[in-house]
């Protein structure tokens, strides 16, 4: 089970839930005590409900990992896709965000009080960098160029409350998207590619952890005569 916990914690989609679960284990919830002398408060019941909700989600994730075969080979597209599908199933069972949903949530919550377009784009840049996303198409540069053009035309900084100015900016974005070959109907494909990219990175980290663990084991005297197995042959289900 220790390996399973470590394995699960490598998934960014699950990290938040697991951290909460660990925190709940550390909190002395008085509602769990068998003392009959004190009344149960609503706050205790709410905390108890949160605890069991997170615990059930964690168990659901472990149950899925007991059934699904995961190959630690980030260079194999089929293995990456399988891992991504397993993580998607876990997210759905545990009612957690996908990477694209998490990014959208970050954007919605962190930009709601930003008044001007430039600060908004800078915040998007910050979120992209923080999430480890690359801008291979150059869309970010295009958006700043579009903003420069609009602000030059209106001769003042563009506020998000300026409907006419924002319409001009959106029109410039659409021109830029067309040049870059970005289409709205392709958004589901971009989201899928993002999930696969994240899955590959996580699978690569899992592989590195497995190799490190085996090499550490190999240094122990009782294992020096044993041949280290190919990491791709490991079956995670055997460790859960």
From Swiss-Prot:
Transit peptide range is 1-32
The UniProt function text for this chain reads: Mitochondrial membrane ATP synthase (F(1)F(0) ATP synthase or Complex V) produces ATP from ADP in the presence of a proton gradient across the membrane which is generated by electron transport complexes of the respiratory chain. F-type ATPases consist of two structural domains, F(1) - containing the extramembraneous catalytic core and F(0) - containing the membrane proton channel, linked together by a central stalk and a peripheral stalk. During catalysis, ATP synthesis in the catalytic domain of F(1) is coupled via a rotary mechanism of the central stalk subunits to proton translocation.
Please tell me the species this chain comes from. Arabidopsis thaliana
Q: Which InterPro entries match?
A: MGP1 (IPR031432)
Q: Know the name of this protein?
A: Probable ATP synthase 24 kDa subunit, mitochondrial
The UniProt entry's GO CC annotations, sorted and at most eight, read: chloroplast; mitochondrial inner membrane; mitochondrion; nucleolus; proton-transporting ATP synthase complex; vacuole
**BP term (GO), one:** proton transmembrane transport
Origin superkingdom = Eukaryota
Q: Which UniProt keywords apply?
A: CF(0), Hydrogen ion transport, Ion transport, Membrane, Mitochondrion, Mitochondrion inner membrane, Transit peptide, Transport
Q: Which GO terms describe its molecular function?
A: cobalt ion binding; copper ion binding; zinc ion binding
Q: Which compartment or compartments is the protein found in?
A: Mitochondrion; Mitochondrion inner membrane
Q: Where is the composition biased (Basic and acidic residues)?
A: 210-222, 229-240
Residue span of region Disordered: 210-240
């Amino acid at each position: 089970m220790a390996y399973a916990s470590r394995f699960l914690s490598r998934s960014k989609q699950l990290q938040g839930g697991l951290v909460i679960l660990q925190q709940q284990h550390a909190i002395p919830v008085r509602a769990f005590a068998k003392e009959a002398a004190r009344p149960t408060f609503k706050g205790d019941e709410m905390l108890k409900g949160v605890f069991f909700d997170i615990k059930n989600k964690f168990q659901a994730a472990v149950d899925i990992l007991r059934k699904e075969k995961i190959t630690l080979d980030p260079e194999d597209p089929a293995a990456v896709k399988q891992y991504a599908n397993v993580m998607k199933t876990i997210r759905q069972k545990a009612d957690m965000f996908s990477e694209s949903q998490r990014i959208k949530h970050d954007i919605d919550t962190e930009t709601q009080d930003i008044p001007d377009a430039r600060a908004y784009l800078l915040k998007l840049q910050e979120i992209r960098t923080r999430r480890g996303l690359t801008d291979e198409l150059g869309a970010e540069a295009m958006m700043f160029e579009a903003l420069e053009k609009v602000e030059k035309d209106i001769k003042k900084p563009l506020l998000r409350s300026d409907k006419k100015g924002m319409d001009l900016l959106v029109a410039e974005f659409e021109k830029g998207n067309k040049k870059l070959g970005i289409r709205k109907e392709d958004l589901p494909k971009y989201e899928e590619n993002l999930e696969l990219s994240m899955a590959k990175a996580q699978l690569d980290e899992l592989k590195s952890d497995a190799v490190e663990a085996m090499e550490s084991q190999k240094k122990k005297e009782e294992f020096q005569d044993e041949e280290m197995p190919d990491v791709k042959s490991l079956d995670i289900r055997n460790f859960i």
